Amino acid sequence: MQLHWFRSDLRIHDNTALHAAASQGAVIAVYLVTPQQWQQHEDAACKVDFWRRQLIDLSQQLAGLNIPLLIRHCDTWQDAPQQLLEVCQQYDIQQLHCNAEYGFNERHRDAATRQLLQQHAIGFNRCLDQLLFKPGSIRTQSDGYFKVFGQFKRICQQRLYDQLPQVLPAPKPQAKLAIQADAIAQNLHDFSLGGYCLNDADQTSAATKIDSIATQWPVGEAHAMQRLA
């Protein structure tokens, strides 16, 4: 069994790690709700609610592929490795797949997760997905960093000319698993375990505010592709 760990890659199309997981066997997916970590990063309530709404859409898409989406809660990313290990042990996971994220806390989170899983003979596959090139991989002939942007740009363009990144399709539907997907909370307060609310004394006004944000920022891959067209 393979496990895909969704983070900021809440999509099924052109998802490198999800594609890798599905190509190696039956796959389940997991998402970690970490309210205290989000607050440390000063993520706004409207941003967290966007994630919540996108997860609902994603869960429906995954259901069409027979990939159950599990929701787990922990306060911060320091708790993520243990939480993921428990999921892996519960479902006899052979390898966890995720797409690389490059923030300071993100890199420490992933390193700790890799270390813990490897101690239990569970693989950790971190894929290049959000960038065209792995950070630090564009170097001079003397293996140094470029000091002139024009030269750096030419090397990047040459590499893209030689081989453009492949656009990956959504995974094909797999055989149905005897694993139930977790429900996703229908409001921000419950989703964040009380960590986020609109802080509005007038709840009617608060509901109008969140509805307005949802209208201006619709979720779903179809809307995103339409805006990019």
Where is each model-derived feature located?
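Trp/Phe/Arg-rich N-terminal binding region typifying the photolyase-homology
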Residues: M1-L164, L168
